[in-house]
Every structure is written in C-alpha cells, then in structure tokens.
UniProtKB/Swiss-Prot annotation:
Enzyme Commission (EC) number: 2.5.1.145
Gene: lgt
Native organism: Nostoc sp. (strain PCC 7120 / SAG 25.82 / UTEX 2576)
Binding residue positions for a 1,2-diacyl-sn-glycero-3-phospho-(1'-sn-glycerol): 141
Protein's UniProt name: Phosphatidylglycerol--prolipoprotein diacylglyceryl transferase
Cysteine pairings via disulfide bonds: none
Length: 283
C-alpha cells in the first residue's frame, strides 16, 4: 500500500545530531550548505565572464556578515513584543527566526560598500551573485520544514504538511495539516534560478547580450512576485498593524525590479561592467 504524501512531509525535528555538548541543527547545516554552494556557483559564473573568482570569494564574506545579522535584526524588530520579554533569545539564531528580506537588504548594503572599497562595478557583481542568492534561498527554505515553522493555512491537499500540536497557532490547534509554504517557495526559487541561469548563458553567447544589472533586476522582480502570493497563505507572517510586512516589501521589490529593468533599457549609456580578471590582478 502506497504511503500518503503527507507522511513524507512530517518533520523529524530541528536537530540533526548531538555529540556531547555539540548540537548540529538542520537549519544551520542548510544555511552553511547554501553559502558553500552559492560561493562555488558565483565563482564559476565569474570565470565564465572572465572575472577574477577570488573577488567573489571576498564578496561572499561581506555578504554573510551583512545578510545574516540583518536577517535576524529584521525578524526581531517585527517580533519585538515577544523578544522584549525574553531578550536572551535575541541572539539564538540557531532556533530559527530570520527574514530573507532583511538578508537581502543587509547583503545589498554590504555589497555596495564592498564594491566602493574595491572600486569595482556593483551591478556586475550583483548579476554574478543573483543566481547564487536564489539557489541559496531554495536550499535554506527547507530549514523551515525541520523547524516546523513558516507554514500556511490548514489544508487537506495530498501534499499537506503535518505540524506538531505545540507548533500550531492557538486558533488553529485543532488542525493537523497545513500548506507547506516552505516547499512552494523552494520550488518557485528553483524556477527563478533556472530562468536566471538560462539568461546568463544566453547572454554569454550573445542571444541576446543583456545589459549589466538585468539579472539582479529580474531576480528582484520574480522572487518578489512569488513571495507576494506565498506570503498570503502563511499563518505566521510578520505584521505591522493590519499589513503583512513581507507582502508590502514584495510589492516594493516588484516595482523596483520592473522600474530598474525599464531604466536599464531606456538609458542610452550602459552601466560599467569592467571587473578585473585574475590575469589583470596577477592572481
């Protein structure tokens, strides 16, 4: 007898293994995996564009330093009523509770500072990193599965997700199965990744040659579009009064992405795209 698909969507728990005082959590492992794969991919894309891959290695350190604390701060700010009562939990990032929009904001600011200090074009770096960002998001979303968090409304669809009673919202405690919104977003992110990689290699072959900044703008608009819909299904959205913060930010991301694309293709002078190669830097 075939097992129901819901059985496959039952989290084994947030902890992968405990070795003495050391606890390895799925969430941390997935974030580390996403970073490693993202750095490797961005270096590969840099080589294809004849850009020094070491530049992307250096940038990745800045992105992690900028993105992860910003993601946590963003989350804590919009859950301040809870963390004000338990301030010791503010730094407990291993328990979950980071916001991707905070990571995007923090990472972008870090990349801008990096580009300024290194005197390299920000937009070409952004294009090289965009596919890695969305792939990392697709991987990292599975941390929500293991933590039994960021799920959607109750559902009886075949791919429903079982949520333990202690993780259910108080007003939905009688329901067992919920929309696996982590899965929806992970699949959407993989689709955006496929689009960006296709555009990258077609541009590399000149079919057509994209303007610098295009990939990042496409990333911003398409990711935000998917998040706008998926956020509407969730039961634990960060709120500001009656507004779902992620939907407001997603609408802003769609507008900025589309406006950015229009700006890139209307302006007559293209953005600079000269980044030193390994040969130029002697590395």
């Amino acid at each position: 007898m075939a097992l129901p698909l819901a059985f496959l969507f039952t989290s084994p728990g947030p902890v992968l293994v405990e070795i003495g005082p050391i606890t390895i959590r799925w969430y941390g492992l997935l974030i580390a995996t996403a970073v490693l794969i993202g750095v490797s991919l961005s270096q590969y894309l840099a080589k294809r564009r004849q850009v020094n891959p070491d530049l992307l290695s250096d940038l990745s350190i800045w992105l992690v330093i900028g993105a992860i604390p910003a993601a946590r701060i963003y989350y804590v700010l919009f859950q301040w009523s809870e963390y004000a009562q338990h301030p010791e939990r503010i730094i407990a990032i291993w328990q979950g509770g980071i916001a991707i929009h905070g990571a995007i904001i923090g990472g972008t600011l870090a990349a801008l500072i990096f580009a300024k200090l290194k005197r390299v074009p920000f937009w070409q770096l952004a294009d090289l990193v965009a596919p890695s960002l969305i792939l990392g998001q697709a991987i990292g979303r599975w941390g929500n599965f293991f933590n039994s968090e960021a799920f959607g409304r109750p559902t009886n669809l075949p791919w429903k997700l079982y949520i333990p009673i202690e993780r259910r919202p108080p007003d939905l405690v009688s329901f067992e199965y919920f929309h696996p919104t982590f899965l929806y977003e992970s699949i959407w992110d993989l689709m955006v990744f496929a689009l960006l990689i296709t555009l990258f290699f077609r541009s590399l072959a000149g079919k057509p040659r994209l303007k610098v900044g295009t990939l990042f703008m496409v990333y911003l608009a398409t990711y935000s579009l998917g998040r706008l819909w998926i956020e509407g299904l969730r039961t634990d959205s960060l709120m500001l009064g009656p507004l779902r913060i992620a939907q407001v930010v997603s609408l802003t991301g769609i507008a900025l992405g589309l406006a950015g694309l229009a700006w890139l293709y209307v302006r007559k002078r293209p953005l600079p795209d000269v980044v030193p190669s390994a040969k130029d830097t002697g590395e």
